[in-house]
A protein has these predicted regions:
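ABC transporter nucleotide-binding domains
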Residues: 1-234, 316-337
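Short catalytic/signature loops enriched in Gly
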Residues: 19, 226-329, 334-337
């Protein structure tokens, strides 16, 4: 069952006469009890997409759907939507008011939505977030907590509204390595126990491997590759995905991308990744006869299908036998690690 969906979503910003296409045609679904990782480097549009799914940005075209119903932008509709779809920010220190106790921080949402049994909600949310006994934390302030405990308070603040979807923007980026695993395990436990769905926004493919059911890789406002996590991260087809994976510690040879970082005000013709593409630069695209297409023919917008799909002229042109051999080799390599 699809809970949250982006359908041909486009978001634009205009500044000093320049139009930035931050999200430039995205189809994405998050199903019931599913964790989807949205991956990409800074500036690719993933945070703007997440904010739009929350109703914090209004799309230029396309639509956001929740439970199959398009999101309306009246105050009442947005209020109801944000109770069902809650945001978890990456910096717990910045998202918690230092003058508010843990109780006040978690109770803020139920008070805004005028929900009954405030004390019980706060205690239950803290307990589900792993802060037990919850009463022990009621009167503490953020500076009295560890980084992991502060992130659990932020998660508890979302859980206090009984949402069905969490949108977590870099949920462990500011945490020590020793605490990251605890927070990821908590998100998985909430999915298993409460049936929560989650969209996890991250630049870290290692995090996606540990937590996600599906991965969507975003570059310059579009999803360029998506599919089941095992398929995408063991046998990536898009050169951008390959470059992101190559910086993981287990990778034998990192790919250094040339060219300029993505600029949403200057989207190149053809494949939007071609100015930095290592496949095009190496001559491999010319060998398959698609180098001209890479620089001239735009690629179609990927659908919201859960099956593996890629927007790449070179990947589409490679013989099926070569693709199978590459996928089999990648799978063996991951198992060996």
């Amino acid at each position: 069952m699809t809970l949250l969906e982006a359908r041909d979503l486009r978001v634009e910003f205009v500044s000093r006469g320049r139009r930035a296409r931050a999200v430039d045609g995205v189809n994405l679904v998050v199903g019931q009890g599913e964790i989807v990782a949205l991956v990409g480097e800074s500036g690719c549009g993933k945070t703007t997409l997440a904010r739009t799914l929350l109703g914090l940005e209004r799309p230029a075209s396309g639509s956001v759907l929740y439970g199959g119903v398009p999101l309306a932008y009246s105050s009442r509709a947005l209020r109801a939507h944000r109770r069902e779809v809650q945001l978890v920010l990456q910096d717990p220190t910045g998202s918690l008011n230092p003058r508010h106790t843990v109780y006040e921080a978690v109770a803020e949402g139920p008070r805004i939505h005028r929900l009954p049994a405030e004390g019980e909600r706060v205690a239950s949310a803290l307990s589900r977030a792993g802060l037990r006994p919850p009463e022990r934390f009621f009167n503490r302030y953020p500076h009295e907590l560890s980084g992991g405990q502060r992130q659990r308070v932020v998660i508890a603040g979302a859980l206090a509204l009984d949402p069905r979807v969490l949108v977590a923007d870099e949920p462990v980026a500011s945490l020590d390595a020793s605490v990251r695993g605890e927070i990821l395990a908590l998100l998985l436990r909430l999915r298993d126990e409460l049936g929560l769905s989650a969209l996890v926004v991250t630049h870290d493919l290692g995090l996606a491997w540990n937590i996600a059911d599906r991965v969507a890789v975003m570059y310059l406002g579009r999803i360029v590759e998506s599919g089941p996590v095992e398929r995408i991260l063991t046998a990536p087809s898009h050169p951008y995905t390959q470059a992101l994976l190559s910086v993981l510690p287990e990778s034998p040879s990192p790919v250094v991308l040339g060219g300029e970082p993505p600029d949403p005000t200057r989207i190149p013709p053809g494949c939007r990744f071609h100015p930095r593409c290592q496949i095009l630069a190496s001559g491999a695209a010319a060998e398959t006869g698609v180098d001209g297409l890479c620089v001239s023919r735009p690629l179609p917008v990927l659908s919201s299908s859960a099956a593996a799909q890629v927007a790449c002229h070179h990947a589409e042109a490679r013989p099926a036998s070569t693709r199978r051999e590459a996928e089999a080799g990648a799978g063996v390599e991951v198992e060996r690690r």
